[in-house]
């Protein structure tokens, strides 16, 4: 036994015991690093109350926060992806699907629901980015078309929240075909004169941005959302030049006229309802009642990991 081990064995120092904090009660802001109470963050729709950073939000949480309580009906839930090409990169596609389905609880990357928004019938779709980066495959395209068909049947507006890395490479040309398929479906909305509002969230890239995500009668973005086709790193490597600060972010795009407006997530529900009421010649909606306040307990030690 070394001299230091003998000294340590004689010491009466007892290790500090961390507080017994349940898993998931606290989290950290992706931007400012502030320790946040999970319940308060959920109440604030995954927007940091300290720096206003808009974190990524699950598809079902988006739709539940948008549509009136008790009005939601899911569409296209029976559609499931198939590994038609028997595709394999470093891992089999069917195994990637199984992992994504287990981790997210979703069958694919797009969730579609119909319901009411301040009493007005609407159809809404939202991407689940945690499902293979929100990539667009055959099921995503089919569900989006189902959303359009339902909006046409109900003679109501369509809203889509995009959060995607683009077309799903594991489905090759079948995924690229969804760009044309979804765009053609939206042409029917235009013929009928029904509003389609596209909400661009972080990130909206690739084949999704090159198709239905940018085809809204109104294209609304969340603050600081990354929106484009190729990513900034790929562009820099290609052109061999440093890109401007904030390139491809929503604030940059609105300056260039590529999008129509930027709306903070907590204000989005009322903003969408107000716009659609105007477009559908309906009475203006009243503001929602304030959400019930959350009592935030003392912040734990900074070295505690949620």
Curated annotation (Swiss-Prot):
Keywords, alphabetical: ATP-binding, Cytoplasm, Fatty acid biosynthesis, Fatty acid metabolism, Lipid biosynthesis, Lipid metabolism, Metal-binding, Nucleotide-binding, Transferase, Zinc, Zinc-finger
Keyword Phosphoprotein: no
Zn finger residue spans: C4-type: 29-51
One GO CC term on file: acetate CoA-transferase complex
Gene Ontology MF terms in the entry: acetyl-CoA carboxylase activity; ATP binding; carboxyl- or carbamoyltransferase activity; zinc ion binding
Keyword Nucleotidyltransferase recorded: no
Entry function: Component of the acetyl coenzyme A carboxylase (ACC) complex. Biotin carboxylase (BC) catalyzes the carboxylation of biotin on its carrier protein (BCCP) and then the CO(2) group is transferred by the transcarboxylase to acetyl-CoA to form malonyl-CoA.
Name of the protein this chain belongs to: Acetyl-coenzyme A carboxylase carboxyl transferase subunit beta
Organism (species): Cronobacter sakazakii (strain ATCC BAA-894) (Enterobacter sakazakii)
């Amino acid at each position: 036994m070394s001299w230091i081990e003998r000294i340590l064995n004689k010491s009466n120092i007892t290790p500090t015991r961390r507080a017994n904090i349940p898993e998931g009660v606290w989290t950290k802001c992706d931007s400012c690093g502030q320790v946040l109470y999970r319940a308060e963050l959920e109440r604030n729709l995954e927007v940091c109350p300290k720096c206003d950073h808009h974190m990524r939000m699950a598809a079902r949480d988006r739709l539940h926060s948008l549509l009136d309580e008790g009005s939601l009906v899911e569409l296209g839930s029976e559609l499931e992806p198939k590994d038609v090409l028997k595709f394999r990169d470093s891992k089999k596609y069917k195994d990637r699907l199984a992992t994504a389905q287990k981790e997210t609880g979703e069958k694919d990357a797009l969730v579609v629901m119909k319901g009411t928004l301040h009493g007005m019938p609407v159809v809404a779709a939202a991407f689940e980015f945690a499902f293979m980066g929100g990539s667009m495959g055959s099921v995503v395209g089919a569900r989006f078309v189902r959303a359009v068909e339902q909006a046409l049947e109900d003679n109501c507006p369509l809203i889509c929240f995009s959060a995607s890395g683009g077309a799903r490479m594991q489905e090759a040309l079948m995924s690229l075909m969804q760009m044309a398929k979804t765009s053609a479906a939206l042409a029917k909305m235009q013929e009928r004169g029904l509003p389609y509002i596209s909400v661009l969230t972080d990130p909206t890239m690739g084949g999704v941005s090159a198709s239905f995500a940018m085809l809204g009668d109104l294209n609304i973005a969340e603050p600081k959302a990354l929106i484009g086709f190729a990513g900034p790193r790929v562009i820099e490597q290609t052109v061999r030049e440093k890109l401007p600060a904030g390139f491809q972010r929503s604030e940059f795009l609105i300056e260039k006229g590529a999008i129509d407006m930027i709306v903070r997530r907590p204000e989005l529900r009322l903003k969408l309802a107000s716009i659609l009421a105007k477009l559908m010649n309906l009475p203006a909606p009243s503001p929602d009642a304030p959400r019930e306040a959350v009592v935030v307990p003392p912040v734990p030690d900074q070295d505690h990991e949620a």
